[in-house]
Every structure is written in structure tokens, then in C-alpha cells.
Design a protein with these regions (language model features):
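Non-catalytic terminal/interface segments that mediate subunit docking, oligomerization
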Residues: 114-168
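Conserved catalytic cores of soluble enzyme domains
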Residues: 1-86
């Protein structure tokens, strides 16, 4: 939902921000004050909606299309995190064989170091069940962050994306 004024400082320092399109807003002051001070018309969405915070400010890590989708994103995120600092992240059985070989990896990275390639293909290929849970997908496309599993164990991924601006 909406968060305005001094209360908006709290979400900015939390671990994860999940917003819902058309329903979640974060801003210090609203459109009416902006109008009275700058004489600009700005909507709540433009000022601090999910799109703004997932593409421009980078505050939002995940954005749901609706409440149902947002809740499913939260459940998926929590499936990678321990319940507390004294526990390990959840282990998940996989049907992937431990000695799985994928010949497509031999062709993914070009010989020419100046030629771009899609690092997401590599990430998805090596992770269990070819599944990568990406965070901040629409912010800074030259870097990739998220979670996956190797051998059932949770791993965090931080990677350059050579396909955009030659990576980070």
C-alpha cells in the first residue's frame, strides 16, 4: 500500500521491498504538495509507484502485477531464506543429476572478449532445475542479482551482464 512522509524512510533500509503495481507508493511528499511548490502535475505512480521504484530508484526488489502475484513473489523469496540467523537456508531436493552436463555452455561465451553474451543463460543453465529467482530485474540491467540452488542448497548470485553496457 501507500507509504508517505517520514514513514517512507523505514522501507528504504529494509532487506527487501516488494511492491504491487497500481497499489504501492512510497514518497516523502505527495502529488498535491509537489503541485503547490513546483506547479507540476505528477501522479502518485510517477512520483513513487512500483514502476518508478523498480526501474529508476532501485528501491523495489520485486513487483507484483496484483496482490495475488505479489504474495506469490513473497512466498518464493522466503523459500530461499532461513527463518532466522541461526538456521541454514531451506534445502530443496532436485531431480537434476549431480554430474549433469550441458554442451550449450561450451558455445555461450564468445572467443572475442569484446563480444557480448547473455549471462542469464549461463546462470539458468547451471542452477538446479534451470531456475533463477532474480531480484531488481528492471533496475541496472548490466548487473544480475538473485537466488538459485546448486545441489539443493541456496546460493546467492551477483553477476555482470555483458549484454548491457558490457557489464558492471
Amino acid at each position: 500500500g501507500p507509504c508517505a512522509g517520514v514513514a517512507v524512510y523505514s522501507p528504504a533500509i529494509t532487506d527487501f521491498i516488494i511492491m504491487t503495481k497500481g497499489r504501492s507508493y512510497m514518497f516523502i511528499t505527495g502529488p498535491d504538495v509537489i503541485k503547490s511548490v513546483t506547479h507540476e502535475d505528477v501522479t502518485m505512480e510517477e512520483l513513487g509507484g512500483a514502476e518508478t521504484h523498480s526501474t529508476i530508484s532501485g528501491i523495489a526488489h520485486l513487483v507484483g502485477e496484483d496482490d495475488h502475484h505479489t504474495l506469490s513473489l513473497i512466498r518464493e523469496l522466503l523459500s530461499f531464506l532461513p527463518s532466522n540467523n541461526m538456521e541454514e537456508p531451506p534445502f530443496k531436493e532436485t531431480s537434476d543429476p549431480i554430474d549433469r552436463v550441458d554442451e550449450s555452455l561450451n558455445l555461450l561465451i564468445p572467443e572475442n572478449p569484446n563480444q557480448p553474451y547473455d549471462m542469464k543463460i549461463l546462470i539458468n543453465t547451471v542452477l538446479d532445475d534451470n531456475y533463477f529467482f532474480e531480484l531488481q530485474e528492471n533496475f541496472a540491467p548490466n548487473i544480475i542479482i538473485g537466488f538459485g540452488r546448486l545441489g539443493g542448497r541456496v546460493v546467492g548470485i551477483v553477476a555482470n551482464q555483458p549484454e548491457h553496457l558490457a557489464g558492471a
